[in-house]
């Protein structure tokens, strides 16, 4: 047990999400032994370093530059909101796909960007000189922001297009400063139809075998004079990157070296056994339950209306992804016995502490368990509140935002009685019938899972005035609140607004939310400090071994091999083929998530795939498995071979990897990637995107077919 527990955060075999600027030499040498052929400097420091081709995609995914004119590959689900924003019932790019036949046809996107990491360095000594650990969490965050702002101000004097963030690593035992350059003129160039980009939908999400062609293509535009970042302008030109990833058509075989570089969002592998119990019981379980209720309503409305589907496809996908993740993670926690493994390992740390005196009087693992036990109910109630009331329907979102004062007064210099606020018209992003039904269903569900004494005041009205009918209460608010009137002036100081039913509803929700935050604040600082010390003790106990920090949406490298695993006791295989997607397409009438257009069925049923056929297997390969260490945020991460060439994009993990955020098991956890040859095949044979193929340097493949 202890040996297994050790692998939770100490690097064994190919485990780890490594920062590139200080990659341990031992890790690099292991990469070489497994097939990486490039010099150490090719990862971070050289002008043509791999880091210069990898981007943070819009703050939630990863991507890779693949051409000298700034083409970016990312996942279809990462670009999905951009695709949705351009879609209408008449021009449904989500459903039917899109290809810009010229630069002029490439579509700009609001609120999307790519960010290049320019530099990273350790500033722990500076933060410790500020005695950062002497302060509360809230004060620590203020100090981190202050340092980052000061560093940004300094670097902007040298280059105004740069900014710096400061992040804690190793549970706050280290601090790194990272310099970024953001490009905000990002345009949609190519996307496959939803039938292929989301093939298998929720049925296949987190599952293997997989056939999804999960990719989309964007282009970075830059200032024509400086090649630097610029706000959108028709005068901007394609960005000329320092380095781009060469696209490989050579494929891979079982055991080949594979490396991901991207932006994993969050892991908690140093988390205590008590923290894992809380995650399982007070977070994952209620999250899955509430989202199940919400998603059932959403899906029914989406299936009934194309217009509603366009509005909610992205919202549904985001919700259902972590609904299924929560279910799978809990099953893995229990089936693997992770809590007990962690408990056994904590006993080992306690023995080390007792024998050495390290952190004596500071780290108290038993006390940490008591702290978690005392806040369990409040944490679960907070999760239920957030899943029920935060961003689940338009009225509740507006009510809470208004109560928090987040809607700016339009005329602050006017007399108090004349001051008004106004909500932006976002009616193209929501549907009243769907939102009303979701709101009523979640109100009812919340009452069934929270103690009566902890419910907001308006539940008394639901029972006394509305006879317990949640839909009638919901409809009353929607029909009678000024918050839902399009372009209405909301005179914030008027008695009418103060007595508005949805305004009161929002204020009562805010009261509950503040009370929950207050309760949780009583223990959060002490819990976080004990978790930090637990991490410090672990690293000290294993100081002769390399350690990687938990993911925090900074660039990380993971290396491993192409290969399958045992799935239900049988070999899983390490790739899928065109034949397998055709078999699923035949079941489209039984499961709408396997439906595909006739042209896609024809393309995937071809008798000869020409140069897209794998030379080793003789098959057209679609998706493949590696044991790279990934998590959310790695979506769109390039998968490189040992020569630094692009062989695919990471887009998912398997069901058995769902405890990977807290525990990595290289025998079970797998990264699912979409084969770049599959991507190029559809760009070629479906999209006829010759100009993009030539731009990426795969024109010879096109002509050879």
Regions found by a protein language model. Give the residues of each.
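Bacterial N-terminal signal peptides
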Residues: 1-7
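Terminal presequence/propeptide segments associated with secretion/organelle targeting
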Residues: 8-705
């Amino acid at each position: 047990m202890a040996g297994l527990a050790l692998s939770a955060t100490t690097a064994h075999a190919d485990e780890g999400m490594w920062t590139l600027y200080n990659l341990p030499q031992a890790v690099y040498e292991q990469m070489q032994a497994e097939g990486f052929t490039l010099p150490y400097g090719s990862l971070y420091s050289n002008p043509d370093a791999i880091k210069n081709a990898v981007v943070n995609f819009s703050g939630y995914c990863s991507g890779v530059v693949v051409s000298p004119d700034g083409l970016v590959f990312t996942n279809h689900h990462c670009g999905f909101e951009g695709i949705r924003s351009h879609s209408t019932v008449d021009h449904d790019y989500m459903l039917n796909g899109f290809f810009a036949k010229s630069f002029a046809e490439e579509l700009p996107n609001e609120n999307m960007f790519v960010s290049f990491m320019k530099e990273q360095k350790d500033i722990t000594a500076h933060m410790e000189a500020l005695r950062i650990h002497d302060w509360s969490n809230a004060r620590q965050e203020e100090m981190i922001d202050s340092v980052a702002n000061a560093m940004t101000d300094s670097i902007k004097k040298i280059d105004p297009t740069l900014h710096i963030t400061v992040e804690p690593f190793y549970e706050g035992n280290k601090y790194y400063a990272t310099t970024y350059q953001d490009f905000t003129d990002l345009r949609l160039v190519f996307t496959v139809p939803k039938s292929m980009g989301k093939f298998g939908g929720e049925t296949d999400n987190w599952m293997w075998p997989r056939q999804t062609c999960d990719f989309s293509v964007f282009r970075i535009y830059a200032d024509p004079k400086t090649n630097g970042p610029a706000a959108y302008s028709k005068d901007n030109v394609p960005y000329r990157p320092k380095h781009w990833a060469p696209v490989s058509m050579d494929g891979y075989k079982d055991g080949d070296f594979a490396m991901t570089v991207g932006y994993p969002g969050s892991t908690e592998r140093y988390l205590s056994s008590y923290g894992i119990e809380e995650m399982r019981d007070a977070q994952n379980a209620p999250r899955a339950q509430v989202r199940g209720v919400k998603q059932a309503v959403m899906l029914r409305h989406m299936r009934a209306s194309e217009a509603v589907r366009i509005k909610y496809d992205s919202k549904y996908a985001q919700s259902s992804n972590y609904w299924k993740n929560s279910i799978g993670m809990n099953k893995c926690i229990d089936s693997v016995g992770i809590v007990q493994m962690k408990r056994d390992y904590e006993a080992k740390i306690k023995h080390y502490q007792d024998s050495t005196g390290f952190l004596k009087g500071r780290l108290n693992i038993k006390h940490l368990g008591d702290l978690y036990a005392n806040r369990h109910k409040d944490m679960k109630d907070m999760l239920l509140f957030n899943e029920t009331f935060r961003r689940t329907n338009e009225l509740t979102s507006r009510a809470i935002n208004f109560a928090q004062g987040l809607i700016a007064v339009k005329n602050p210099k006017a007399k108090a009685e004349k001051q008004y606020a106004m909500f932006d018209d976002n009616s193209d992003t929501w549907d009243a019938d769907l939102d009303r039904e979701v709101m009523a269903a979640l109100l009812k569900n919340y009452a069934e899972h929270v103690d009566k004494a902890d419910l907001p005041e308006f539940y008394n009205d639901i029972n006394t005035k509305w006879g317990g009918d949640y839909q009638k209460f919901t409809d009353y608010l929607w029909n009678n609140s000024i918050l839902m009137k399009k372009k209405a002036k909301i005179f914030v100081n008027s008695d009418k607004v103060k007595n508005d039913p949805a305004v009161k509803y929002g204020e009562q929700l805010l009261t509950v939310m503040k009370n929950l935050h207050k309760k949780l604040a009583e223990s959060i600082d002490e819990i976080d400090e004990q978790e930090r010390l637990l991490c410090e003790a672990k690293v000290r106990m294993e100081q002769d071994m390399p350690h990687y920090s938990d993911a925090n949406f900074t660039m990380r490298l993971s290396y491993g091999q192409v290969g399958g695993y045992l799935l239900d006791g049988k070999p899983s295989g390490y790739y899928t083929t065109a034949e397998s997607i055709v078999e699923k397409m035949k079941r489209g009438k039984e499961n709408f998530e396997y439906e595909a257009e006739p042209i896609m069925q024809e393309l995937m049923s071809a008798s000869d795939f020409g140069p897209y056929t794998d030379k080793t297997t003789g098959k057209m390969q679609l998706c493949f498995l590696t044991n790279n260490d990934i998590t959310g945020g790695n979506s769109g991460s390039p998968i490189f071979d040992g020569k630094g060439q692009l062989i695919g994009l990471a887009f998912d993990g398997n069901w058995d990897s769902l405890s990977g955020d807290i525990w990595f098991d290289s025998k079970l956890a797998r990264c699912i990637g979409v084969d770049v040859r599959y991507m190029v095949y559809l760009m070629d044979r479906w999209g006829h995107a010759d100009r993009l193929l030539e731009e990426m340097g795969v024109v010879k493949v096109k002509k050879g077919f």
